[in-house]
Amino acid sequence: MPHSYDYDAIVIGSGPGGEGAAMGLVKQGARVAVIERYQNVGGGCTHWGTIPSKALRHAVSRIIEFNQNPLYSDHSRLLRSSFADILNHADNVINQQTRMRQGFYERNHCEILQGNARFVDEHTLALDCPDGSVETLTAEKFIIACGSRPYHPTDVDFTHPRIYDSDSILSMHHEPRHVLIYGAGVIGCEYASIFRGMDVKVDLINTRDRLLAFLDQEMSDSLSYHFWNSGVVIRHNEEYEKIEGCDDGVIMHLKSGKKLKADCLLYANGRTGNTDSLALQNIGLETDSRGQLKVNSMYQTAQPHVYAVGDVIGYPSLASAAYDQGRIAAQALVKGEATAHLIEDIPTGIYTIPEISSVGKTEQQLTAMKVPYEVGRAQFKHLARAQIVGMNVGTLKILFHRETKEILGIHCFGERAAEIIHIGQAIMEQKGGGNTIEYFVNTTFNYPTMAEAYRVAALNGLNRLF
């Protein structure tokens, strides 16, 4: 006789991965519950990560545009805004996103349960509710989408009022004049842009020898130059020896012997999965040192009825990819296999000022692979649309095979880069000879547009062939 469960599946977490999984499951007729530890749905992406940081960036970039564009400002007065005012803008966006996502669950009759989940056995969860009660829930299968949080080394006092991580920085109540940022990954670089855009002094401590080494080197070098040009002090190949909080700020002692002092510190060096409270040992699952789970191509863990998606499985740790992972896992859970799969070349968007976006191979990778490629470039300053809106900083770079004309990689630096990249991505994904740089020469673009950069870059690259 088949076992009776409360639900066909329980999804732990309501971020992009959890939402994608839950929506995919209910659309296939499954009885689903979503467990969310906080009062509102959306996960870290909506409340502490992607959405608020991008809302902050947008507000700051508009202030920069006002102060630098002679159409708006004669430089006799500068527009300034407090960090608190800019945070209010982010809060408004968060509230809109939360209401919208709550509506998704309500319209699809997907039950939301608030509390902290932990496994009791292979098919049973205990739910620690906010009122102190404990509920027992059973399901045939589970999808873990509990996300990640900023990594906290034990020798850093995050209870100090001037030491922040990328979550708590959104609760800053003072106006910093000087910020230390430890960790020059994506989050560190994005916040360096935000604070410098607010005219705050920034020291960016990088534990490696260049910024964002996974990027095409020209993109990384462009970001380094613009940071330098804006006044950000970048310190490469440095690690902290000791971090001490004091009454008027933070002092960082580096292993190189240097000492740095600032009003506050943003520690942005790594993240860890939110798995420590799930009691995974009760179902025979283990995580790595960063709290992450290993999965197969269908997002199954070592326990075939337990799936995991999003930040909790590590790379690529992107909200966009997490949603797709959730959708694919839902299909695999219901049907036993997934016909859909993540695309091979996942685009990355880095919301520094200016933006950076990439898809496909870098020049360094193609050179190491001994692929005969050529480069086509378009400078934003040569585009009519960029001249009209005063968006002169930036470039689009297309890497393509010299012989087949196949597009191998696209890299964009400049305002709206994360939007512009998708035009090229759409062509790269075409099969049967559809992926060719000649598409951009043979099609007609609206004029004037930023999309026209593809035609300019394609002509530039094809003209290099002989």
Swiss-Prot record:
GO terms for cellular component: cytosol. Its main location: cytoplasm. InterPro entries: Class-I_Pyr_Nuc-Dis_Oxidored, FAD/NAD-bd_sf, FAD/NAD-binding_dom, FAD/NAD-linked_Rdtase_dimer_sf, Pyr_nuc-diS_OxRdtase, Pyr_nucl-diS_OxRdtase_dimer, STH_gammaproteobact. Its EC number is 1.6.1.1. Disulfide bonds: none annotated. It is an enzyme of class 1 (oxidoreductase). Keywords: Cytoplasm, FAD, Flavoprotein, NAD, NADP, Oxidoreductase. SUPFAM superfamilies: FAD/NAD(P)-binding domain, FAD/NAD-linked reductases, dimerisation (C-terminal) domain. Binds 1 FAD per subunit. It is found in: Cytoplasm. It comes from the Bacteria. One of its GO terms (biological process) is NADP metabolic process. The keyword Cytoplasm applies. It catalyses: NAD(+) + NADPH = NADH + NADP(+). Pfam families: Pyr_redox_2, Pyr_redox_dim. GO terms for molecular function: dihydrolipoyl dehydrogenase (NADH) activity; flavin adenine dinucleotide binding; NAD(P)+ transhydrogenase (Si-specific) activity. FAD binds at E36, R37, Y38, Q39, N40, V41, G42, G43, G44, C45. Its cofactor is FAD. Gene3D superfamilies: 3.30.390.30, FAD/NAD(P)-binding domain (3.50.50.60). HAMAP family: SthA (MF_00247). Conversion of NADPH, generated by peripheral catabolic pathways, to NADH, which can enter the respiratory chain for energy generation. Belongs to the class-I pyridine nucleotide-disulfide oxidoreductase family. This is Soluble pyridine nucleotide transhydrogenase. The gene is sthA.
